[in-house]
């Protein structure tokens, strides 16, 4: 057995290293297209240059047919006519402008001839003739109710003005010739479509075969077959891109369109000092050791952009799943000569370019960042309410090599008294990388792993990728092929490519039958070795294909219903993620537990199905710094359950770096350590003194704050709000914070955090957004601050720079435990940071952290309020909780109390006392108070409070 295991391990390692040759080369930028190498991007950039060169004489060749517009049930339906030659020949483009109850506007444009399937395909292709129009089917889940009060308030031969939204504050001014739209709020222009005349809808046209020896004009050279990196894209429908310039008037700062490694406030892309010379690209790809400060594409895409200026936010969703590029230019407006010292407002001009599909854009007019997040969440869904364990610490590497190895790691965490919740298995746990199997030599009894972990409430996550090994006597692949559930190549055959197992096929999760089949594979009786505490990691779902064009599959591959891969590429990862999410919900009849599924690839809507991480980063300071910005951007783009590999996937981090990374990651929404197979082991108990102790302290800080984390996720689930909140989101009136991306507030807790992400740095400057009082979280000292200025904090290696803003009440569980499950029925501590007005408030949301019973009212949701005269707890929704029939969990929570209250700040004459009187449910009793006033820290500790966390109570302070 021992010899067999060694040989198997060696062969697996050699196989992995051989496979690694493919993706490792992909880090080189020349393996990924630049705009000039992508025909449709080059054509549209050239189109923009042509328009700019002609300036005021440029006329966009698109106009709305004068007899076509009509408004009915909140929609204007019309036809845009595109003039395509000097003879005046025109192409008809049906357009629908929808005004929604939410105040969001939607514009869709299609191509009539392709709607009617009146085109010819080249190369004998069987691909769909229509433009892809199903992205909304996957991404949009609500918010489409029409605004029946929308009305035309002005119409003539040149334009139509539609008033819509709450109290009619929004207006769309639709210019008929050339076609353009001006979206206004309170009469002021905020977003303009086609202001620069760059709208371009490449209509279908037949290929004209030229006489032998005659070359195609340069404009046509990229219309048809296109070769890159040795792969030829046949493009059977010819050129079909859609592009539009969208201007944000008066907005210098725009955010979003993840996933990229640049700053939060997006850079310009047309060159110049400090700017990019390439557009931001969204084309999900497996990019090893990705480059920092780059617009280069990464693993996921969310085509959502938000613009913000003082007291105003707007945004848009470009709902297109094809390869997409975005150019950004920032301009200064014209100064008013009558205004003394008036600085001209900046504006941002964007140019969106997608290879295929229809034009489908949603416009959000705010006015606040919270409005944008909420409306986007109504459309695409909000973050799934996670299981509580998912917010704990996850320990992973490629790879824990045997069940004994896994059990030993688990025991060592306990020996060192380091909390963790989940241990992960990468691809080597399988039998020769055949998913839904365990290696029969190194994982002979995987159930024993699950049972050992379960004894302390811990979980196991195993990886399942979408590539299925193409080999005989493997039932999963045999079923995939016999049921015809795989992706096909352009000729209609099952597509074959290389990935970790070698020759592989890919499940096509656009196929409803494939999704149903996928569910059967996860049932406990079919996935032997799994149990109730086993969860799933979806990797490589861009999809990643070794040696494929740009490390993925050919664009002319065919999916279910004969849609080309080019049409759906950025959706592919989400459909796989969604399929696994639904599969975990149906593992056992009658088991209604929340799934946990991690994904690498994502799109708008992926937030409904679990967490994401930023892929294969490096163990260096730059990647640590960038991770903070990337995760903040994920949050304001609607996908806040996000993380990055701690402390870098590639490389062996120095002790200082790994320590600072743990301190930073204690504030990642998704907190997982992960490392490459060639790295040294670096579990926190191996770091040595003093680093193990410091990392452990960061982990314990995370666990103590889990009640606040869980409440913050509840908000994200409820209204789409980000977990890590940038300064512009929390303080939209403070102009100094619009570009800050290295500090954040944790939800609405008032915790202001600025992790140390530089070598040999032992102090830092935190920007203060308002004139409220701030306290040091660890010492309770009042920090001398000034609105709009920086304050310097000491940050020795064992300290996380962290303030708590006055006016907040946060919840903690302070007893160290091995896992979050073992803390579930621990008592709570309240930490109150008193505002300068001697007030504070906060909330606690808690449920069983596992099931969907919260949908039936099985939860506790409390509002804590401090006024100058009373501290109280009431139901946050005003429910009469006595009328709720308690289930098992709610009954158990009757024994859970708020036992300690720490009051930071406030006036000594209120808190410098020996005891307070506590009232709850008709009873009154005394609780002792310890008052501290030394070294600039004024705080009171109320001990043995003894109030049930789910009941009303008060402490009067007269």
Provide a role label for each language-model segment.
Residues 276, 280-283, 298-301, 515, ...:
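Short, hydrophobic/amphipathic alpha-helical packing segments
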Residues 581-596, 601-614, 623-630, 634-644, ...:
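Catalytic core of carbohydrate-active enzymes
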Residues 124-126, 132-139, 419-695, 730-732, ...:
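Aromatic- and carboxylate-enriched substrate-binding clefts and catalytic-loop regions
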Residues 20-391, 396-398, 403-411, 422, ...:
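N-terminal accessory segment at the very beginning of proteins
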Residues 91-92, 156, 166-168, 176-177, ...:
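Short, well-ordered loop/turn elements at secondary-structure boundaries
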Residues 1-26:
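Fungal secretory targeting signals
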Residues 192-193, 277-316, 573, 616-641, ...:
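Internal mixed beta-strand/loop scaffold within catalytic domains of large alpha/beta enzymes
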């Amino acid at each position: 057995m021992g010899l067999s295991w060694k040989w198997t391990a060696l062969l697996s390692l050699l196989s992995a290293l051989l496979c690694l040759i493919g993706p490792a080369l992909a880090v080189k930028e020349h393996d990924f297209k630049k705009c000039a190498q992508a025909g449709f991007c080059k054509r549209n950039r050239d189109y923009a240059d042509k328009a700019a060169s002609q300036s005021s004489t440029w006329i966009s060749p698109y106009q709305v047919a004068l007899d076509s517009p009509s408004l009915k049930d909140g929609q204007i339906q019309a036809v845009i006519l595109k003039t395509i030659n000097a003879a005046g020949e025109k192409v008809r483009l049906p357009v629908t402008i929808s005004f929604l109850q939410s105040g969001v506007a939607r514009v869709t444009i299609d191509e009539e001839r392709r709607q009617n399937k009146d085109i010819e395909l080249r190369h004998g292709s069987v691909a769909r003739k229509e433009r892809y129009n199903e992205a909304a089917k996957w991404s949009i889940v609500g918010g489409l109710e029409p605004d029946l009060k929308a009305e035309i308030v002005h119409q003539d031969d040149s334009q139509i003005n539609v008033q819509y939204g709450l109290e009619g504050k929004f207006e769309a001014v639709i210019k008929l010739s050339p076609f353009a739209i001006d979206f206004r709020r309170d009469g002021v222009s905020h977003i303009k479509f086609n202001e620069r005349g760059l709208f371009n809808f490449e209509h279908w046209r037949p290929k004209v075969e030229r006489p032998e020896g005659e070359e195609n004009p340069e404009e046509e050279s990229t219309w048809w077959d296109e070769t890159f990196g040795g792969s030829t894209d046949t493009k059977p429908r010819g050129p079909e891109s859609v592009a539009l310039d969208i201007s944000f008037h008066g907005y210098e700062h725009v955010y979003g369109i993840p996933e990229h490694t640049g700053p939060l406030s997006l850079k310009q892309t047309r060159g110049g000092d400090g700017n990019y010379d390439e557009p931001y690209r969204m084309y999900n790809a497996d990019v090893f050791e990705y480059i920092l400060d780059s617009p280069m594409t990464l693993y996921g895409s969310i085509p959502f952009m938000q613009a913000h200026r003082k007291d105003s936010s707007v945004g848009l969703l470009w709902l297109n799943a094809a390869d997409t590029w975005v150019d950004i230019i920032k301009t200064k407006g014209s100064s008013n000569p009558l205004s003394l010292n008036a600085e001209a407002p900046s504006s941002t001009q964007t140019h969106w370019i997608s290879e295929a599909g229809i034009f489908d854009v949603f416009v959000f007019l705010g006015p606040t960042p919270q409005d944008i997040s909420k409306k986007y969440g109504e459309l695409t869904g909000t973050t799934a309410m996670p299981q509580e364990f998912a917010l704990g610490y996850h320990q992973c590497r490629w790879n824990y090599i045997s069940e004994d190895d896994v059990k030993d790691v688990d025991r060592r965490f306990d020996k060192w008294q380091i909390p963790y919740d989940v241990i992960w298995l990468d691809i080597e746990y399988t039998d020769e990388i055949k998913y839904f199997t365990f290696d029969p030599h190194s994982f002979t009894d995987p159930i024993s792993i699950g049972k050992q972990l379960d004894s302390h409430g811990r979980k196991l996550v195993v990886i399942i990728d979408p590539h299925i090994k193409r080999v005989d006597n493997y039932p999963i692949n045999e079923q995939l092929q016999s049921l015809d559930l795989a992706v096909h190549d352009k000729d209609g055959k099952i597509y074959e490519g290389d990935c970790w197992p070698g020759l592989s096929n890919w499940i096509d999760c656009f196929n409803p039958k494939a999704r149903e089949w996928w569910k059967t594979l996860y049932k406990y009786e079919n996935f032997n070795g799994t149990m109730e505490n086993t969860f799933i990691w979806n990797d490589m779902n861009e999809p990643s294909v070794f040696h494929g064009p740009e490390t993925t599959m050919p664009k002319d591959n065919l999916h279910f219903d004969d849609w080309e891969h080019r049409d759906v590429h950025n959706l592919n990862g989400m459909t796989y993620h969604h399929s696994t999410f639904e599969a975990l919900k149906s593992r056992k009849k009658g088991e209604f537990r929340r799934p946990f599924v991690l994904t690498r690839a994502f799109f708008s809507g992926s937030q409904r199905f679990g967490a994401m991480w930023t892929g294969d980063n490096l163990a260096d300071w730059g990647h640590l710094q960038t991770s903070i910005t990337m995760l903040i951007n994920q949050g304001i783009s609607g996908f806040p359950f996000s993380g990055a590999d701690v402390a870098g996937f590639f490389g062996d981090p120095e002790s200082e770096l790994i320590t600072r990374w743990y301190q930073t990651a204690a504030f990642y929404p998704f907190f997982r350590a992960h490392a490459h197979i060639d790295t040294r082991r670096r579990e926190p108990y191996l770091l040595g003194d003093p680093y193990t102790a410091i990392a452990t302290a960061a982990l314990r800080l995370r666990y103590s704050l889990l009640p606040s984390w869980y409440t913050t996720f509840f908000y994200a689930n409820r209204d789409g709000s980000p977990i890590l909140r940038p300064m512009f989101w929390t303080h939209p009136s403070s102009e100094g914070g619009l570009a800050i991306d290295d500090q954040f507030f944790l939800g609405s807790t008032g915790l202001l955090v600025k992790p140390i992400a530089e070598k040999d740095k032992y102090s830092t400057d935190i920007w203060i957004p308002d004139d409220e009082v701030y306290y040091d979280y660890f010492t309770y000292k009042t920090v001398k601050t000034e609105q709009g200025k920086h304050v310097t904090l000491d940050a020795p290696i064992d300290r996380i720079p962290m303030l708590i803003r006055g006016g907040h009440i946060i919840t903690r569980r302070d007893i160290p435990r091995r896992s979050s499950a073992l803390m579930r029925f621990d008592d709570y501590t309240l930490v109150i940071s008193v505002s300068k007005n001697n007030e504070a408030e906060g909330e606690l949301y808690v449920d069983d952290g596992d099931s969907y019973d919260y949908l039936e009212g099985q939860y506790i949701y409390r509002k804590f309020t401090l006024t100058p005269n009373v501290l109280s707890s009431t139901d946050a929704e005003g429910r009469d909780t006595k009328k709720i029939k308690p289930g098992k969990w709610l009954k158990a929570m009757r024994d859970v109390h708020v036992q300690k209250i720490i009051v930071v700040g406030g006036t000594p004459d209120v808190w410098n006392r020996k005891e307070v009187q506590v009232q709850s449910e008709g009873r009154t009793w005394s609780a002792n108070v310890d008052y501290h006033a030394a070294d600039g820290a004024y705080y009171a500790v109320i001990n043995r409070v003894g109030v049930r966390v789910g009941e009303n109570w008060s402490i009067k302070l007269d």
